[in-house]
Amino acid sequence: MSKNIVVLPGDHVGQEIAQEAIKVLEAISEVSPKAKFNFQHHLIGGSAIDATGSPLPDEALAAAKKADAVLLGAVGGPKWGTGAVRPEQGLLKIRKELQLYANLRPCNFASESLLELSPLKPQHARGTDFIVVRELVGGIYFGQRKEDDGDGVAWDSERYTKPEVQRITRMAAFLALQHNPPLPIWSLDKANVLASSRLWRKTVEETIKNEFPQLTVKHQLIDSAAMILIKNPTQLNGIIITSNMFEDIISDEASVIPGSLGLLPSASLASLPDTNEAFGLYEPCHGSAPDLPKGKVNPVAMILSAAMMLKLSLNMAKEGEALETAVKQVLDSGVRTGDLGGSNSTSEVGDAIAKAVKQILA
């Protein structure tokens, strides 16, 4: 039976990288009897605003709700500005509507050959390996707010509930327990200032103690963690959890460690991937890069996002791992886009990965 994948290319480079993800998945389907896909394309973001006036058309949301998984390219661009209707509203809405409460962003080196591209010294960057787990549907991004209506006052509010924090803590614990020995959990907050952070810290501590006593959790203030991330990133190896906005910031900081935003994938899940069939939305960590010429964007992050989809949502661990291996082989061979010091185009990198994964699975 084919897996139904809704593809939301989005804006600018999102169109190109979505094509490359489909290319490698179709290559896998040629050699793996289990891997059969039905791709449905829909609009989101600025392209959706241009066509329909809405950043997330009803038909796109309805299709996503019926799909086995969603692949998303990238959303946004200066064309749509910061007006009342913005591309990013489509992202926030689909996350909320699909109850995608946990965003997973691995931070590691897809290949050791990329160490020299890190802005950090190799001796500091080598061995960096953690997963940032972001609470995705609560906090200040979804709290009450007031716009400046001419009185010169605007505000946003952060609200978290105990069940919301428990849920994201259980996701972190599940991921930690997939390793032997289990990985440590780092919980980042601002408990010395914010009431919401004090609830966060208390709830994380209680949940781990009562439900996962075999795990260790370490609490770190977010500003201190940001410093550690640059000074000694391997100190944070393991699973990192924090609130929506803090994770948005810290994960972008972490994303530059491997040398390019074009390398890091992400998964947004609606449940624990304990059966390898959790519903999820998969997208690269980078944005839509509107200034990048055609054929220059690195498709690796999008392709690795597809690998995460295979493993976490489609119960195709063998195929997902083969795709990750193919990416490593291609990068090691020197086939790279310009952000990695190479001269290959987007499609050439995709072609090479598609060829490599077929050879691995054949």
Swiss-Prot record:
Its cofactor is Mg(2+); Mn(2+). SUPFAM superfamilies: Isocitrate/Isopropylmalate dehydrogenase-like (SSF53659). Gene3D superfamilies: Isopropylmalate Dehydrogenase. Substrate binds at R95, R105, R134, D223. NAD(+) binds at residues 77-88, 287-298. Its EC number is 1.1.1.85. GO terms for cellular component: cytosol. The keyword Isomerase does not apply. The keyword Protein biosynthesis does not apply. It catalyses: (2R,3S)-3-isopropylmalate + NAD(+) = 4-methyl-2-oxopentanoate + CO2 + NADH. Disulfide bonds: none annotated. Pathway: Amino-acid biosynthesis; L-leucine biosynthesis; L-leucine from 3-methyl-2-oxobutanoate: step 3/4. Mg(2+) binds at D223, D248, D252. Keywords: Amino-acid biosynthesis, Branched-chain amino acid biosynthesis, Cytoplasm, Leucine biosynthesis, Magnesium, Manganese, Metal-binding, NAD, Oxidoreductase. The record marks Y141, K190 as: Important for catalysis. It is found in: Cytoplasm. Belongs to the isocitrate and isopropylmalate dehydrogenases family. Catalyzes the oxidation of 3-carboxy-2-hydroxy-4-methylpentanoate (3-isopropylmalate) to 3-carboxy-4-methyl-2-oxopentanoate. The product decarboxylates to 4-methyl-2 oxopentanoate. NCBIfam families: leuB. Homodimer. This is 3-isopropylmalate dehydrogenase.
